[in-house]
Amino acid sequence: MAGILGAGVQDGLLLKPIKYQWAMDLYDQAVANTWFPNEIQLAQDLADWDKMSDEERHAVTFLMSYFNPNELLVNKALAFGVYPYVNAAETHLYLAKQMWEEANHCMAFEYVLDTFPIDRTMSADTLPMT
């Protein structure tokens, strides 16, 4: 029986029998916790936004736009740095769900950045890299 690490191609093509129950448990938990950004009501958040100082709004804008591309970096790290090197199908399922979650986080940040009256020219993703 192959271990959990390897090329990830020849092994890991069949889900059953499950070799790593912890991976299936994580996958099941992740599926049960599925959420969608556009289902989040932001009315109270928008009201709170209006009460913030300019400095507070700038901090929120900067942090939201900073974390957004970093979610995609986590996704790429999982896709290219981990996924190809695991063999078990159940670990592939969990990693695929985790990659979806990272993309969903990115879309959540975009949803907030698009919903709030934010000047994207002042956000972290538009600042020149030094």
Positions of PLM-derived features:
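Non-heme di-metal
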Residues: 1-130
